[in-house]
Amino acid sequence: MLEFELREIDRFDRAICISTDEMAFFSNVTGKVKLYYLPHFVERGKLIEKKKDIDIVFVGSSNEHNQRGLIWFLEDVYPRLKEYNFSIAIIGEIVDKIDLAKYSNIISMRHVEKLEDIYSRTKIAISPLQSGTGLKIKIVEALSYGIPVVCTFKSIIGFPNKLENGCIIADEPKIFANAIIELIKDEKLYNEMQKQALRQYEMIFNANRAQESIRNIFQIESKIK
């Protein structure tokens, strides 16, 4: 796959990278190609006034990286959270691949009509990925709703800044569990992480900001007077 990407990218004068890590890599291995950074952007999430009855949410497809990450969470992190009786929601096609019935206080939904309904009820999101590359879109979505994220370092690959971005990074099960507990229990910390999440979204992933970047990349003059 890498050889294919390197061969194909050299056919073009310009290339767009949605990840700063990928941009840094390609800048070292390509010659003539002009590289631009354009992260995946989303519209600002609109929260609905609802009771926050979901403590933790994981949203994901059924790909092998999500499966591996969720299994790690369920086997190594979840047992450390059981005494707190947190409400956990697993959303997406991932629920077809993992038997969740044996876990108490976990609700699973293969499909939801509007993710905003789930995010409006959610306190924090998790991304326990153990493998994979590229920008994790579900983290971006959570940040757009001002939802703090507890994640592994693998999950944060592709973000231009790894600190003060609305995410707490933890690669060890005990540290991951403690980060979840502290974030849910400590209101002051939670409020600060919410602010970081929204600030990160506005600075990097806001759709309006992306439009200006696109104009610069394609050298399109803005028609906004």
Regions found by a protein language model. Name each.
Residues 1-15:
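Membrane-proximal helix-turn-helix segments that form the acceptor-binding/catalytic region
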Residues 2, 28, 36-108, 112-120:
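Conserved catalytic-core segment of nucleotide-activated headgroup transferases in glycan assembly
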Residues 138-141, 148-152:
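Short hydrophobic beta-strand element within catalytic cores of glycosyltransferases
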Residues 153-169:
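Short acidic/histidine- and often glycine-rich active-site loop of Leloir-type glycosyltransferases
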Residues 188-219:
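A charged, aromatic-enriched C-terminal amphipathic alpha-helix characteristic of glycosyltransferases
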